[in-house]
Amino acid sequence: MLTDRQLLILRAIIDDYIQTAQPVGSRTLSKRDDLTFSSATIRNDMADLEDMGLIEKPHTSAGRIPSEVGYRYYVDHLVEKQIIDERETGRLEERLKQSSKESEILIRQAADLLSDLTNYTTVALGPNSQMETLARVDFMPLDERRGVVLIVTDQGHVEHRTVMFESRVAPDVIEETIRLLNDRLVGTPIGQLKIRIGEEVAKLQLAQRQQYENMMQLIQSTVGIQTPSSLYLGGKKKIFNQPEFQTLDTLRPFLEWIDEQERLTHWLESLPNREIYVSIGSENGIVALQNCSVITSDYTLDGKTFGTIAMIGPTRMNYRHGVQMMGQIIEALRRTKLDE
């Protein structure tokens, strides 16, 4: 159990190190207006904090830096619960609304905004479209032999495929086929569409089958492609701005990891569903992130849990600001309506 004085000193050490990236000594702390203790008292408490594993001495300096344990204590006990700034959330909501009504563009914009607000790299994971349900099927003709099939999901995800007819198909046949599919298949999970369209073809009477079977089968072929969760990356190069990532030995593992989209997607999908959470260094369980902290949260659009967004920075990240900005973005996304 830390004394009130030790809490103040630990907070001051971490706050100072976050700002300067330089080890902190007792002399530096004694000059702070918010610490009215002598250098000797501060040195004694710093020795106790080091014995508890909350701070550590780097090889090349007389000062101290936070340890992973220290950062965890700081995040759990010294980072105050942030209150949503209604004015800031409103501004972010307006910026998201101006970007698009399509979920993919909104999520990408949210990732970019969060990166700009924090100066950290961000990753946003959209839903796996196979887990969504069909909202509607549309068709846009390009010419007499070609057109684009649009599959729109309940969460605003849009998949489009260009199709080519072997021979000209009458516009009324196309229109009626789309109507039949929408009447019978809206609400079907995307992953089951291929089977369901086949079932609907089998139900058609002979006269209908001659008219609509080819068109239905053509549309059926477009939904057979498995679509992974959408992944959006913001501010990838911002890691270059951090003093901890100025050498190839520290930078290369991070860049190689973040460039492997399949592995990155799997990692985000494996995170437990929860509100804002901070994982620090080795807690991430990934070698490339051993010098990083990650702030993650689920987010919602139109009242539905939509995906996960993560902010990645050094373990020396500004946790207060990061948690605050994550909360603002999550709230702005929650308030944004796709159909307005």
Curated annotation (Swiss-Prot):
Short name of any one Pfam family annotated for the protein: HrcA
Function according to Swiss-Prot or TrEMBL: Negative regulator of class I heat shock genes (grpE-dnaK-dnaJ and groELS operons). Prevents heat-shock induction of these operons.
InterPro entries given in the database record: GAF-like_dom_sf, HrcA, HrcA_C, WH-like_DNA-bd_sf, WH_DNA-bd_sf, WHTH_transcript_rep_HrcA_IDD
Keyword Repressor assigned: yes
Source species of the chain: Exiguobacterium sp. (strain ATCC BAA-1283 / AT1b)
Gene that this polypeptide is encoded by: hrcA
SUPFAM superfamilies given in the database record: GAF domain-like, Winged helix' DNA-binding domain
Protein name: Heat-inducible transcription repressor HrcA
GO biological processes: negative regulation of DNA-templated transcription
A single GO molecular function term of this UniProt record: DNA binding
